[in-house]
Amino acid sequence: MTNMRKTHPLMKIVNNAFIDLPAPSNISSWWNFGSLLGICLILQILTGLFLAMHYTSDTITAFSSVTHICRDVNYGWIIRYMHANGASMFFICLFMHVGRGLYYGSYIFLETWNIGVILLFMTMATAFMGYVLPWGQMSFWGATVITNLLSAIPYIGTNLVEWIWGGFSVDKATLTRFFAFHFILPFIIAAIAMVHLLFLHETGSNNPTGISSDTDKIPFHPYYTIKDTLGALLLILVLMLLVLFAPDLLGDPDNYTPANPLNTPPHIKPEWYFLFAYAILRSIPNKLGGVLALVLSILILVFMPLLHMSKQRSMMFRPISQCLFWILAADLLTLTWIGGQPVEHPYIIIGQLASIMYFLLILVLMPMASTIENNLLKW
């Protein structure tokens, strides 16, 4: 009798994805982040579900309901902080996952890569709307500033903003719809993540060398299940250290002040994981130009396969490209730092230089380095 996991219609799907899946024998810990993202998503959906049971999406009671969750609901404080810091862990894993894809040339799998970029956009949208829900000062003003950017779109901009707001300012209608979208989007993300996996399993995983590993595969279980379990334990360790020892480390103190449309905070800034894009937005003195640069800073990932000039897939054996990749990583850290600083000298010029450097590295320097490396191979 054949094994049930190989014949049962449902178990067969799980088996082919997580048990008998042929995986390259040499994938490193950089390949752990996919499963960690899955864990983050499940964690966010579960904690979010319990928060939604006690949250009220009304401008008058939203802030109080979050306070009530932390003070009066059994273990409400830990659920709330796991959800808030879980988002930070989610984005750390996302950035690592995308960085891995860039370094090892995983973007050559076009469908998988493009669905991944869609997932990134959707996760960013979900996180933004979630940040609005506690209805603190930074929630309100963050929502006002970011939604207002759409008014830069010619002709339809103003109508579009008022349509999203559901009125003439960020108010009850906005909060209610943001809660509705924030609730539904993670389930859509989960569905698209399944499609992401489906396309990945059509081709099989990439590996650090960037060379086909068809001749050297090992079963996913037990080798990578145990490896992913270690990654998951480390993820939970870091998350719980944050939650239990420094729950507000990555938050903004302004969000402990209830939203007040009559009082603007001195420095409006988003959560840390959006600061790099926010810095790029602020570095351009024109509104429409800034919005375009903001969108392009993420959308540029779609063009990575077109910008791939190297004869090798991975950066493993390309020292010049490696150097530029780590300069890009440092540049993103610089932009993240600048995004959290006030708009004054010297931060303005640093932000502008870092923004120029970001696009220059991706669009010009890295393709040039690839071409140079191709020519060096001929020697």
Curated annotation (Swiss-Prot):
State which residue ranges cross the membrane. 33-53, 77-98, 113-133, 178-198, 226-246, 288-308, 320-340, 347-367
Q: Where in the cell is it found?
A: Mitochondrion inner membrane
What GO biological process terms are annotated to this protein in UniProt? mitochondrial electron transport, ubiquinol to cytochrome c
Residues holding heme b b566 = H97, H196
Query: Is Iron included in the keywords of this UniProt record?
Result: yes
Give the record's cofactor note, including how many are bound: Binds 2 heme b groups non-covalently.
| CC annotations in GO | mitochondrial inner membrane; respiratory chain complex III
Bilayer disposition of the protein? Multi-pass membrane protein
Query: Which InterPro entries does this entry report, sorted A to Z?
Result: Cyt_b/b6_C (IPR005798), Cyt_b/b6_C_sf (IPR036150), Cyt_b/b6_N (IPR005797), Cytb/b6-like_sf (IPR027387), Cytochrome_b (IPR030689), Cytochrome_b_C_euk/bac (IPR048260), Cytochrome_b_N_euk/bac (IPR048259), Di-haem_cyt_TM (IPR016174)
SUPFAM superfamilies in the cross-refs: a domain/subunit of cytochrome bc1 complex (Ubiquinol-cytochrome c reductase) (SSF81648), Transmembrane di-heme cytochromes (SSF81342)
Record keywords, A-Z: Electron transport, Heme, Iron, Membrane, Metal-binding, Mitochondrion, Mitochondrion inner membrane, Respiratory chain, Transmembrane, Transmembrane helix, Transport, Ubiquinone
Q: Give cofactor(s), names only.
A: heme b
Binding annotation for heme b b562: H83, H182
Coiled-coil segments: none
Q: Which GO-annotated molecular functions does the record name?
A: metal ion binding; ubiquinol-cytochrome-c reductase activity
Query: Which positions does UniProt annotate for a ubiquinone binding?
Result: H201
Q: Which Pfam families match?
A: Cytochrom_B_C, Cytochrome_B
Q: Which family does it belong to?
A: Belongs to the cytochrome b family.
Subunit note: The cytochrome bc1 complex contains 11 subunits: 3 respiratory subunits (MT-CYB, CYC1 and UQCRFS1), 2 core proteins (UQCRC1 and UQCRC2) and 6 low-molecular weight proteins (UQCRH/QCR6, UQCRB/QCR7, UQCRQ/QCR8, UQCR10/QCR9, UQCR11/QCR10 and a cleavage product of UQCRFS1). This cytochrome bc1 complex then forms a dimer.
Q: What job does the chain carry out? A: Component of the ubiquinol-cytochrome c reductase complex (complex III or cytochrome b-c1 complex) that is part of the mitochondrial respiratory chain. The b-c1 complex mediates electron transfer from ubiquinol to cytochrome c. Contributes to the generation of a proton gradient across the mitochondrial membrane that is then used for ATP synthesis.
What does the miscellaneous comment read? Heme 1 (or BL or b562) is low-potential and absorbs at about 562 nm, and heme 2 (or BH or b566) is high-potential and absorbs at about 566 nm.
Q: What is this protein called?
A: Cytochrome b
Q: Which organism is it from?
A: Kobus kob
The gene name reads MT-CYB
